[in-house]
Structure formats: C-alpha cells, structure tokens
C-alpha cells in the first residue's frame, strides 16, 4: 500500500479492469437474456 511512487498500483488497475469487464459481461448477458441484446 505504501509502494505507490506516483504511479497507479498494479492491483488497483487489475481490480478496476476486472470490475469493468464483469460489469460489461453482466450487462451484455442480462440484455441478451431479457431480449434487449438479441439484435447485437
């Protein structure tokens, strides 16, 4: 936690990227199952 030398820590990038990817996949699958994403 104290190893941040002005740069963004790698674990923070991985966490944010993982949350974004999971969120996008969740929205995509939810849309496709509810019929909204069937046109994609």
UniProtKB/Swiss-Prot annotation:
Keywords linked to the UniProt accession: Chloroplast, Membrane, Photosynthesis, Photosystem II, Plastid, Reaction center, Thylakoid, Transmembrane, Transmembrane helix
Subunit structure, as described in the record: PSII is composed of 1 copy each of membrane proteins PsbA, PsbB, PsbC, PsbD, PsbE, PsbF, PsbH, PsbI, PsbJ, PsbK, PsbL, PsbM, PsbT, PsbX, PsbY, PsbZ, Psb30/Ycf12, at least 3 peripheral proteins of the oxygen-evolving complex and a large number of cofactors. It forms dimeric complexes.
InterPro entries hit by this protein: PSII_PsbJ (IPR002682), PSII_PsbJ_sf (IPR037267)
Biological function: One of the components of the core complex of photosystem II (PSII). PSII is a light-driven water:plastoquinone oxidoreductase that uses light energy to abstract electrons from H(2)O, generating O(2) and a proton gradient subsequently used for ATP formation. It consists of a core antenna complex that captures photons, and an electron transfer chain that converts photonic excitation into a charge separation.
NCBIfam families noted in UniProt: PRK02565.1
GO biological process: photosynthesis
Disulfide bonds: none
Organism: Nandina domestica
One Pfam family matching this protein: PsbJ
GO cellular component: chloroplast thylakoid membrane; photosystem II reaction center
Family classification: Belongs to the PsbJ family.
Transmembrane segments: 8-28
Primary location: plastid
Protein name: Photosystem II reaction center protein J
Cellular localisation: Plastid, Chloroplast thylakoid membrane
Membrane topology listed for this record: Single-pass membrane protein
């Amino acid at each position: 936690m104290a190893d941040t030398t002005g740069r963004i820590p790698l674990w923070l990038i991985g966490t944010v990227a993982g949350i974004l990817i999971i969120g996008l996949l969740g929205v995509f699958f939810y849309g496709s199952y509810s019929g909204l994403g069937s046109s994609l």
